[in-house]
Amino acid sequence: VLMSKGFAKEEPNKQKRRKAWIRYEREYSLSAGHLDWHDPGNGKQVYVVLDDASRKILAGGEFENATEENSTKLVEEVISKYGYIQIIRETITDHGTQFYANKRDKDGKAEHGFERFLEEHNIKHILCRYKHPQSNGKVEKWFDLYRIHRKRFPTFEEFIEWYNNRPHGSLNLRRAE
């Protein structure tokens, strides 16, 4: 309609074929975990380790402060719970100070507890692009569910139990399966 009235014109660059969208997903559970902190505005900081393949919450908690110690503590929890199957191979995080030291020496090295912990356990640390929350979108989407549904449950643990055992929309399985 707009073209017939002279308000728009064809743009050949927009007609070019675009790359097909590829679903980003690991094949096996425990191959990668998405980690992030969230401030829901209730005085607590929420931190979770979300499995990339199944979307299951492997560990999580509501804390007073978002710290590198708390970040390390939950990855340790994942290793102690699931290490008999496999130690998580990669973590995907943003550049938050809980995960990454922004001040580095000329060789790119820094003294940071969380980074040192990952190195000691041979876990690869994948950093998302700056100001690009889509890179860690699976955990960002989980925070939306947290905001909507958390108030229905008396404890964080009950909320996680509900989340991990509800049917997964695209897999026709529960996250725990």
Predicted regions, residues:
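Charged, gly/pro-enriched flexible loop segments at helix/strand junctions
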Residues: 153-177
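Basic, flexible linker segments flanking DNA-binding modules
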Residues: 1-34, 109-112
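RNase H-like DDE/DDD metal-dependent nuclease/strand-transfer catalytic core used by mobile genetic elements
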Residues: 8, 37-46, 54-158, 162
